């Protein structure tokens, strides 16, 4: 594994301020633009604290949206990813109608998705280029020929913290508000993106209009304050192989035709494309930072007033439906709806009932309702 220590981190500085446009022509002749933004941030990630990092944000927008003004204030949306999969893979799958970002863009929204530090196309701290910073178990699984002893880490702590994630999000939010000349945006988040987006919103309610949270990783046991050591000791990062994703997904299949192999293939291809270094490890993996978490507590949630739509997949075994029901019960917002989505796992946006999810999010973002309801629980797809 020593050879992996020689892999160099990409220089973030050369990316700052760059924007690349890729027009996409839809089947119906309606042109979409995909714009790649790299936003400079003074990092608070402990391994690179004080350095300038580049946060990647993908924009999907209808070309006809054109000139933006204050009248479009409720039409800017920021997607925030979960613990493992970067945002551009999570929410912009390049297969048929599975791009959540594209669905909202076609409805007239200016849609962005960001990668926090260590994910996807954002800056990856150099310690993430060393496979010795994986857990012992993941090192041995990755080692060609089956190594019998793990190597010693060069960085023996979690790579990021929830506070550094909030800092990244805040930098992007402020950039987008200024870029589009609006005072608020809405946020859509998945899994660990729940504590990231809703935790940020709780601190800055004036900047967030509405929330849509798929499988929000809420726990009533979350610590209110940071641990004694920040970041916590342990692996700096984790990896996922194609076989890992297959196994994790398949154990959450609860109905026939829940997902298509072609969708899986599109997701995995995009995953590997987002991580050219990880693609060279073993049979190819995606890397993600380990995050020290705290702060998004039941007290914070009970004080939150931001209108929130939350969704739980009936077969989710990563964030159990009971946790999302707890979140609904604890949330202080007067306008809140919980969707119980049939035939769905943790990966609901890549599955059979993805359009029910997308349609509900659109109604929430435009009207603040689901099936006309401002509050309550809705069962869809049964």
Report the location of each language-model feature.
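N-terminal cap/lid segment of alpha/beta-hydrolase-fold proteins
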Residues: 27-72
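Short, surface-exposed "cap/lid" segments of acyl-processing enzymes
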Residues: 64-113, 123-126
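Alpha/beta-hydrolase active-site loop
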Residues: 132-179
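Alpha/beta-hydrolase fold nucleophile elbow
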Residues: 180-191
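Active-site nucleophile loop of the alpha/beta-hydrolase fold
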Residues: 212-221
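Alpha/beta-hydrolase
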Residues: 221-311
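Conserved alpha/beta-hydrolase "acid-adjacent" motif
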Residues: 317-323
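Catalytic histidine-centered segment of alpha/beta-hydrolase-like enzymes
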Residues: 344-355
């Amino acid at each position: 594994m020593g050879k992996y220590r020689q892999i160099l981190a990409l220089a973030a500085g050369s990316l700052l301020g760059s924007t690349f446009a890729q027009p996409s022509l839809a089947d119906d002749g309606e042109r979409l633009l995909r714009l790649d933004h790299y936003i400079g941030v003074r990092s608070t990630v402990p391994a690179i604290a004080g350095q300038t990092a580049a946060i990647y944000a993908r924009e999907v927008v209808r070309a006809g949206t054109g000139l933006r003004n204050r009248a479009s204030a409720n039409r800017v949306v920021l997607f925030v990813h979960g613990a493992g999969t970067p945002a551009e893979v999570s929410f912009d799958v390049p297969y048929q109608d599975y791009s959540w970002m594209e669905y909202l863009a076609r409805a007239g929204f200016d849609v962005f998705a960001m990668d926090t530090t260590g994910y996807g196309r954002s800056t990856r701290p150099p310690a993430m280029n060393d496979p010795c910073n994986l857990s012992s178990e993941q090192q041995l699984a990755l080692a060609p020929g089956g190594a019998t002893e793990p190597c010693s880490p060069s960085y023996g702590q979690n790579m990021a913290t929830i506070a550094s994630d909030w800092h990244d999000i805040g930098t992007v939010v402020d950039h987008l508000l200024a870029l589009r000349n609006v005072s608020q945006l809405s946020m859509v988040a998945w899994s660990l993106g729940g504590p990231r987006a809703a935790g940020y919103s709780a601190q800055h309610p004036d900047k967030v209009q509405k929330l849509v949270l798929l499988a929000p990783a809420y726990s009533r046991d979350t610590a209110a304050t940071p641990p004694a050591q920040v970041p916590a000791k342990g692996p700096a990062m984790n990896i996922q192989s194609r076989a890992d994703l297959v196994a994790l997904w398949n154990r959450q299949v609860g109905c026939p035709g829940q997902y298509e192999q072609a969708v899986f293939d599109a997701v995995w291809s995009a995953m590997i494309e987002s991580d050219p270094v990880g693609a060279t490890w073993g049979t190819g993996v995606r890397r993600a930072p380990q995050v020290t978490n705290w702060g998004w507590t039941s007290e914070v949630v009970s004080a939150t007033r931001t209108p929130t739509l939350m969704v739980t997949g009936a077969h989710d075994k990563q964030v159990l439906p009971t946790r999302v029901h707890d979140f609904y019960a604890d949330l202080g917002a007067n306008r809140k709806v919980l969707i119980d989505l049939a035939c769905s796992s943790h990966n609901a946006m890549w599955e059979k009932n993805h359009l029910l999810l997308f349609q509900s999010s659109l109604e929430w973002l435009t009207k603040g309702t689901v099936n006309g309801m401002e509050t309550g629980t809705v069962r869809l797809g049964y």
